[in-house]
């Protein structure tokens, strides 16, 4: 089968940094145990499973504050998605050692919100409800940050401030953000805007929009909780006009999707381990619709190959 390997794809620097921080924590014998991650360090189950083998445990819950209630001692790692100031304060009050793996792009958004709300602004924040990144951003100034995800949310806004600013979750579709920003500007013509789609997200979306149209089908390798992976599939369908499916790994690929397909494009979310994506690429490159010996779908990447290598400090 013809395979278009969309580039760039896969890991971004924020994800790699977060994983290296967590990996170094696992290697640091001086850190108090147990070591917990407040939510998924990045949105990929293969990564969290690999960290568990290294003795770092991922805690889950509806929000970071509730997750933190599960921890009474040891070390906590804040994920790449960021946390609210309240979470940081409670971790400190509990006497926990806190390690911050927040993506620098997310930190920049938090700083923008803090600066503008201190100057009297209300913030209209475009993001996905229930996702940890908006949770942390709203938590910077809960009374001043208004989360919107849809046109209905914008219609429901009732803001009277002369000082309004729009910003957004870093992993949203840039086209969705643009459309929602335009609706907000229609309602509040005096609003200022500061688009915060991170560069890694933007170039990956643009690559799909430009390259997926050459294929009959797009496969996005990424975790179901990965917003940027889901947005890549959306971009393929809505911008490039090519049917797309998101899979967590090779085991989720369906042979019926390949019927009548001559060329498939493949990309991966920013938190998808490279070996997982390479395994899917190898299968598709070897797949022949008339050769049953190429049809076997079997994931074989061991957890030991998932995490980046970190040099041990001497």
Curated annotation (Swiss-Prot):
It catalyses: isopentenyl diphosphate + 2 oxidized [2Fe-2S]-[ferredoxin] + H2O = (2E)-4-hydroxy-3-methylbut-2-enyl diphosphate + 2 reduced [2Fe-2S]-[ferredoxin] + 2 H(+); dimethylallyl diphosphate + 2 oxidized [2Fe-2S]-[ferredoxin] + H2O = (2E)-4-hydroxy-3-methylbut-2-enyl diphosphate + 2 reduced [2Fe-2S]-[ferredoxin] + 2 H(+). (2E)-4-hydroxy-3-methylbut-2-enyl diphosphate binds at residues 43, 81, 131, 170, 226, 228, 271. This is 4-hydroxy-3-methylbut-2-enyl diphosphate reductase. GO terms for molecular function: 4 iron, 4 sulfur cluster binding; 4-hydroxy-3-methylbut-2-enyl diphosphate reductase activity; metal ion binding. Belongs to the IspH family. Catalyzes the conversion of 1-hydroxy-2-methyl-2-(E)-butenyl 4-diphosphate (HMBPP) into a mixture of isopentenyl diphosphate (IPP) and dimethylallyl diphosphate (DMAPP). Acts in the terminal step of the DOXP/MEP pathway for isoprenoid precursor biosynthesis. Binds 1 [4Fe-4S] cluster per subunit. The keyword Iron-sulfur applies. It holds the Pfam family LYTB. Keywords: 4Fe-4S, Iron, Iron-sulfur, Isoprene biosynthesis, Metal-binding, Oxidoreductase. The active site is at 133 (proton donor). Its EC number is 1.17.7.4. GO terms for biological process: dimethylallyl diphosphate biosynthetic process; isopentenyl diphosphate biosynthetic process, methylerythritol 4-phosphate pathway; terpenoid biosynthetic process. The keyword Metal-binding applies. Isopentenyl diphosphate binds at residues 43, 81, 131, 226, 228, 271. It comes from the Bacteria. Dimethylallyl diphosphate binds at residues 43, 81, 131, 226, 228, 271. Its cofactor is [4Fe-4S] cluster.
């Amino acid at each position: 089968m013809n395979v278009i390997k969309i580039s760039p794809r896969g890991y971004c620097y924020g994800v790699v940094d977060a994983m290296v921080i967590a990996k170094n924590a696992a290697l640091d014998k001086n850190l108090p145990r147990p070591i917990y991650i407040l939510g998924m360090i990045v949105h990929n189950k293969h990564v969290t499973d690999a960290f568990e083998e290294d003795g770092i445990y991922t805690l889950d819950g509806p929000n970071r504050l509730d997750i933190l209630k599960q921890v009474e001692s040891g070390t906590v790692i804040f994920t790449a998605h960021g946390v609210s100031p309240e979470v940081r304060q409670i971790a400190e009050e509990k006497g926990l050692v806190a390690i911050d793996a927040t993506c620098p792009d997310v930190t920049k958004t938090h700083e923008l919100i803090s600066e503008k709300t201190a100057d009297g602004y209300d913030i209209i924040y475009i993001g996905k409800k229930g996702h940890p990144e908006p949770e942390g951003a709203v938590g910077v100034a809960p009374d001043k940050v208004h989360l919107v995800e849809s046109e209905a949310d914008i219609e429901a806004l009732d803001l009277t401030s002369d000082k309004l600013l729009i910003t957004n979750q870093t992993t949203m579709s840039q086209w969705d953000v643009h459309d929602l920003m335009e609706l907000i500007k229609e309602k509040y013509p005096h609003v200022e805007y500061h688009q915060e789609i991170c560069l890694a997200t933007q170039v990956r979306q643009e690559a799909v929009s430009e390259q997926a149209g050459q294929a009959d089908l797009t496969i996005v390798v990424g975790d179901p909780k990965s917003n940027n992976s889901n947005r890549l599939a959306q971009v393929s369908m809505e911008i490039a006009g090519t049917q797309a499916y998101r899979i967590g790994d090779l085991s989720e690929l369906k042979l019926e999707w390949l019927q009548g397909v001559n060329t498939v494009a493949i990309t991966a979310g920013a938190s998808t381990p490279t070996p997982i994506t390479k395994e899917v690429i190898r299968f598709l490159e070897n797949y022949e619709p008339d050769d049953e010996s190429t049809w076997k779908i079997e994931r074989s990447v061991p957890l030991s190959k998932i995490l980046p290598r970190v040099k041990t400090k001497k």
